[in-house]
């Protein structure tokens, strides 16, 4: 922690994003993650966190909830799926994720429970993946801001090329949307469409442009990345 001038690091920042992978790596990484989030909040920077639970990484003596429950107390925007809420925050998710059909109302209840437990949170976005087959998923998301509950368009993603990076691309799209678009609904739709397109791209990164995402949002459901 002492190796950095934390105040100066956030002097010109407006948004700080972290994922649950970083504090899972080691005790020092967990300490740095918490300190960074606290400092960002103190400096008036918006903090977002993709909970992103990875069981195999938590092997240094602390469980994910022991670390993440404190970290999330310094977060404004949480991003998760139902497993992240359960495994990182200890909040039971009452839904059957392997059924191929998810109930939106269950996600409304889950989002409400998270915000009640963490009143510091301004919003939570939760992704919803209905696995029909290995290469055919229905993909959508919800967002709750403590007052209004939003649901995105549901995409039928067929012939999936690579699911890796789907969550990261959703987070990136949401951050873009919350900073650039007029409403939470628009931000959620942009995030879901960005992640939908990522399923057609091999590798970790969503190499798509804003224009390509907008094409999909405007009704171009071809699923093709424009090149």
Each language-model region and where it sits:
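Ribokinase/PfkB-type carbohydrate-kinase core domain
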Residues: 1-150, 154-157, 212-215, 221, ...
């Amino acid at each position: 922690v002492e190796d950095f001038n934390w105040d100066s690091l956030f002097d010109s920042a407006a948004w700080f994003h972290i994922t649950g992978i970083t504090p899972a790596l080691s005790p020092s990484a967990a300490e740095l993650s918490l300190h960074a989030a606290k400092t960002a909040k103190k400096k008036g920077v918006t903090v977002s966190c993709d909970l992103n639970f990875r069981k195999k990484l938590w092997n240094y003596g602390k469980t994910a909830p022991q670390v993440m429950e404190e970290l999330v107390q310094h977060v404004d925007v949480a991003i998760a799926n139902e497993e992240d809420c359960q495994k990182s925050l200890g909040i039971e998710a009452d839904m059957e994720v392997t059924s191929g059909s998810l109930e939106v109302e269950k996600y409304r209840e889950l989002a409400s429970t998270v915000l009640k437990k963490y009143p510091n949170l301004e919003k939570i976005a939760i992704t919803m993946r209905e696995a029909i087959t290995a290469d055919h998923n229905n993909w959508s998301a919800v967002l709750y801001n403590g007052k209004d509950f939003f649901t995105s368009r549901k995409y039928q993603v067929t012939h999936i090329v690579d699911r890796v990076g789907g969550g990261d691309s959703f987070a990136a799209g949401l951050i873009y949307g919350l900073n650039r678009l007029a409403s939470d609904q628009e931000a959620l739709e942009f995030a879901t469409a960005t992640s939908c397109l990522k399923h057609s791209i091999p590798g970790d990164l969503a190499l798509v442009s804003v224009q390509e995402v907008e094409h999909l949002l405007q009704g171009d459901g071809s699923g093709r990345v424009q090149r």
